[in-house]
UniProtKB/Swiss-Prot annotation:
Function comment: May function in protein sorting in late endosomes or multivesucular bodies (MVBs). (Microbial infection) Involved in MVB-assisted maturation of hepatitis B virus (HBV).
InterPro entries recorded: Adaptor_Complx_Large_Subunit, AP1_complex_gsu, ARM-like, ARM-type_fold, Clathrin/coatomer_adapt-like_N, Clathrin_a/b/g-adaptin_app_Ig, Clathrin_app_Ig-like_sf, GAE_dom
Membrane topology of the entry: Peripheral membrane protein
GO terms of biological process kind: Golgi to vacuole transport; intracellular protein transport; vesicle-mediated transport
Disulfide bonding pattern of the chain: none
Gene, per the UniProt record: AP1G2
Main location, first listed in the record: Golgi
Cellular compartments annotated: Golgi apparatus membrane; Cytoplasmic vesicle membrane; Endosome membrane
Region span, Disordered: 592-617
Name of this chain's protein: AP-1 complex subunit gamma-like 2
Start and end residues of each GAE domain: 665-780
Record organism: Homo sapiens (Human)
PANTHER family linked to this entry: ADAPTIN, ALPHA/GAMMA/EPSILON
Expressed in which tissues: Expressed in all but one (skeletal muscle) tissues examined.
Chain segments carrying region Essential for ubiquitin-binding: 369-379
Amino acid sequence: MVVPSLKLQDLIEEIRGAKTQAQEREVIQKECAHIRASFRDGDPVHRHRQLAKLLYVHMLGYPAHFGQMECLKLIASSRFTDKRVGYLGAMLLLDERHDAHLLITNSIKNDLSQGIQPVQGLALCTLSTMGSAEMCRDLAPEVEKLLLQPSPYVRKKAILTAVHMIRKVPELSSVFLPPCAQLLHERHHGILLGTITLITELCERSPAALRHFRKVVPQLVHILRTLVTMGYSTEHSISGVSDPFLQVQILRLLRILGRNHEESSETMNDLLAQVATNTDTSRNAGNAVLFETVLTIMDIRSAAGLRVLAVNILGRFLLNSDRNIRYVALTSLLRLVQSDHSAVQRHRPTVVECLRETDASLSRRALELSLALVNSSNVRAMMQELQAFLESCPPDLRADCASGILLAAERFAPTKRWHIDTILHVLTTAGTHVRDDAVANLTQLIGGAQELHAYSVRRLYNALAEDISQQPLVQVAAWCIGEYGDLLLAGNCEEIEPLQVDEEEVLALLEKVLQSHMSLPATRGYALTALMKLSTRLCGDNNRIRQVVSIYGSCLDVELQQRAVEYDTLFRKYDHMRAAILEKMPLVERDGPQADEEAKESKEAAQLSEAAPVPTEPQASQLLDLLDLLDGASGDVQHPPHLDPSPGGALVHLLDLPCVPPPPAPIPDLKVFEREGVQLNLSFIRPPENPALLLITITATNFSEGDVTHFICQAAVPKSLQLQLQAPSGNTVPARGGLPITQLFRILNPNKAPLRLKLRLTYDHFHQSVQEIFEVNNLPVESWQ
């Protein structure tokens, strides 16, 4: 007979009394040895006590796997004290990864069949916590019987167990569908809450269930209206709101049932208006109900006045002292800004005020919403606010703010001068945080505004003289001084105060940039080229410029050294050609939002005139290997002859006149996958400098109610093509249209072979693993021809 070891309370006191971690380990190891000995000797009297101590040790992070089989023995015992500890141990020590969890299936089945409510409750709790798919299939009939038991205690647990079963095995939806209609007539709030949760899960999993439960929308409306008009109840009211948990759950279900369904939406419109106007907002419980009401109004086909009411509620949330509520309001308004832009615009001053929040998450959300609210009518006022925020915002927000200002200015700039001033302000304030293409965009903008050349070069010269630490600003200034240095010296700009600059000051400033330790190699390249161009624009002697160029002929940076050697050679051997070579750069067409719209229109016009069908390949069997699927030889495909899209194209070629070809039209996007709210879209870009290269951006979005996790997208192409997969932007797609995942595919197709893609998607959705393998044969012809 094993001498009984410590009681659980004594063990806890001894562990807490340990002075060091070594003493704690010593106590636990000693007690675990006693527990092992007791298990080996099969002591039935103290088994539940030993397992309880082992569970406490497990909670402290120490190994307790040797107690798994003891859980099975205690569950099979007829004593309630043993079963209670046994089921608790099973929930803590067992899961689907251990085969031992299947051994308790028969014990759970027997306990569910008994009429003892506490035992049935223990079995249901365990099944809903760690029940695997196999266990759910075996025990579904027993749980279905318990759904209509007279005891509310058992029915509540059976309903929640059914929710777990549907998440594990969606095909069990048909088993639990019939009892739900009867359960909706219950007056017990706990049963109603569980039933609404079960119906919500059924509707998310099964389109048939969604159609079935749209018939009960009037009943749900009646239940919610009763809750709203009900007086104070000590049993259910929280902060003066009648059962806010049940109200929130009903609103979520109504949102699912009313989405894209006109009749259901009309049925619940009046109720939603009643909830939105009668709910008390002085406490957090009322705010929770109001927020869920707003989400429901946003998702269903609600009336226009109701949507304005929802936006106004979110506007009141912005004035709340609770930061969590303000964050929720900003996030929701950001979702609404595309569909209800004018209604959200009314709260623009409050949103801008949120930029000054000390909380980083709040100011980030306010920044995103402020940028989304910019349009052609308020761009000047919004840019002033955003530029003021840029000067004082935290460093982690400065890059996003600068990029957003540049994009908004490019899209809504009222004048070119205002556009240039805005970009210069961003470069001066946060030059090191701007996007890489900001320098190229500004140089193209200045080059295309001939009337602003003198103004731009003087503004940039002044900014460069004050600060040479902002590298993008220095690069643009050096480029502009090199191109338009003659205008800087002429002093004939009427738009700003007169500025007297001589040649020596300009050269000294560029030399300062070259010698600065803060200058990047690319910046020195800009400055060296600017000096070289000034040799044809200045009237003085070029010896100083030649000396600087010759110095960098021995620079350690290879690119800078090569450039200096070439410039020196230009001075020595080709001086007669130097003026022609260093002429001002011609105008460069800018790629922006307006150019994209024009290209889209020309693309649509071209599609109307082209009627050639795109050949498709039959879908291959999914049983073969992913790469071998695409190894088959593709048939010869005949394409219509390419027609010159330019007007009078044949005449131009006949006369041998110079002709600038139009920019290529954008390739249309393609949706290739959609399942339960998860969508996969492909967008295509073919760089003009490398037509054989195709860049495909995979965008995964999620409009369902559950997050998509562990998302992986793999692809394969025929062996005649080369595929390179870039790393995705993440592996989780948030629910309800959250931030999508993007991934870049680089495909090299030098032979212009017909393009086919084989995609394999794996992800977890609603606690279920999903794997899809499919072939994409309808890729646009423009992506490979």
